[in-house]
Regions:
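Glycine-centered, small-residue-biased loops immediately flanking beta-strands
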Residues: 70
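Short glycine-rich, flexible loops that bind phosphorylated cofactors or substrates
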Residues: 52-54, 80-81, 107, 129
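Glycine-rich, N-terminal phosphate-binding loop of Rossmann-like dinucleotide-binding domains
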Residues: 41, 46-49, 75-76, 102, ...
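Hydrophobic "lid"/C-terminal helical patch
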Residues: 41, 90, 141, 145
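Short, conserved structural micro-motifs that define repeat-unit consensus positions
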Residues: 5, 10, 74-80
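Rossmann-like dinucleotide/phosphate-binding beta-alpha-beta segment
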Residues: 1-67
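C-terminal helix-to-coil terminal segments
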Residues: 106-173
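Rossmann-fold NAD(P)-binding glycine/threonine-rich loop
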Residues: 75-121
Length: 173
């Protein structure tokens, strides 16, 4: 939401909890308003957890409420969207496109029509699972542990004063 606003987009959010100072949205509505908000959405971004309330939430009826040419980004959970209904909306051109890194069945089966749709981008949900990443993480950890013991600067250090008190670090030499 913060990035979308930085790009000049109007951000309309839906969530159970009320607006808090600093929330990066122009409007925030309760989930009960979702259906009436969808006709205003050029992009529908789903970043919700999978719960009894969200499973199958975005069905054919709600997809039809999106404007012609809308796009979907789902980085939440695959089962939130009725995948068959989304595929139909993508094939018919009602949806201009979808960016997905989660699916009803994971990993996405090889026979899924999503692989062949030209208006769909697919990426892994957990890019940290890339080949060789575990080895790089272990090497970085060991190097940083050695640097920490020598009171030298760490690679990729995240400075968070809230967590610092839990893990006091000797001052740099």
């Amino acid at each position: 939401a913060r990035l979308a606003r930085a790009l000049g987009l109007k951000v309309i959010g839906v969530r159970r909890s009320p607006l808090k100072p600093g929330d990066p949205v122009d409007e925030l509505h309760p989930p009960q308003k979702l259906a009436e908000l969808l006709p205003r959405a050029d992009w529908l971004v789903i970043a919700s957890p999978l719960t009894a309330e969200t499973r199958g939430l975005i069905n054919a009826g709600l997809l039809a409420r999106l404007p012609q040419g809308a796009r979907i980004i789902n980085i939440g959970r695959g089962e939130i969207i009725d995948e068959a209904a989304m595929i139909e909306a993508l094939r018919s051109g009602h949806l201009a496109g979808a960016y997905l890194d989660v699916f009803e069945k994971e990993p996405l089966p090889a026979e899924s029509p999503l692989w062949d749709l030209p208006n769909v981008l697919i990426s892994p949900h957990n890019s940290a699972a890339a080949s060789g990443n575990d080895q790089r993480v272990y090497q970085l950890f060991v190097a940083n542990l050695e640097n920490w013991c020598r009171k030298q600067a760490l690679t990729n250090e995240v400075r968070n004063t809230g967590i610092r008190s839990l893990f006091p670090r000797p001052e740099l030499a």
